[in-house]
Amino acid sequence: MNIKLSFISIAFLSLSFNVAANEFEKSQEHYKSVTDLKNKIEILELEKKITELSGEIRNARMPKIDKSAPVLSPQPVVKSSEELQKSIEHIEEELKVELAYLVNNGQQKKYTFNLNGKLITLVNGDFVNGWKFIEDQNKIQFSKGNKVIDVN
């Protein structure tokens, strides 16, 4: 009788060990899947932050556009050709150009200028407001007709 009881208790113990081992394996699989899901969530959150930051950077680079309609006067304003010539000369005299930075990739030089308060990027031969950008060795100039502006 003792042998039967010991045999039954040994069988019961081995069965309970097998069940415990199976439960342990299942819990390990669940732990691994939970850890993988946590890692995926962290990756998605980081990707979301990256896209938000790149959007903020893109918005900061883009100039703000005033979408309000310009106010038009009901009567057209007629100016004489002398007044127009004076205003054109006045505009040309106020062309203020400063070199912000230069990017040289070995094939092409791209110059970024602060032009009347706005940043623009130009390469040799580009036109801006009727002015041609000329880069000749170490000289940087804007020319329009017989007028030349040297950039220091």
Curated annotation (Swiss-Prot):
| Major localization listed first in the record, in broad terms | periplasm
Check the record and name the InterPro entries matching this protein: Toxin-coreg_pilus_synth_TcpS (IPR020213)
Which cysteines in this chain are paired by disulphide bridges?
none
Protein localization: Periplasm; Secreted
Keywords attached to this entry:
Periplasm, Secreted, Signal
User: Which positions carry the signal peptide feature in this UniProt record?
Assistant: 1-20
* GO cellular component annotations of the record: extracellular region; periplasmic space
State the protein's purpose: The toxin coregulated pilus (TCP) is essential for successful colonization of the small intestine.
User: What protein does this entry describe?
Assistant: Toxin coregulated pilus biosynthesis protein S
Source organism lineage?
A: Bacteria, Pseudomonadati, Pseudomonadota, Gammaproteobacteria, Vibrionales
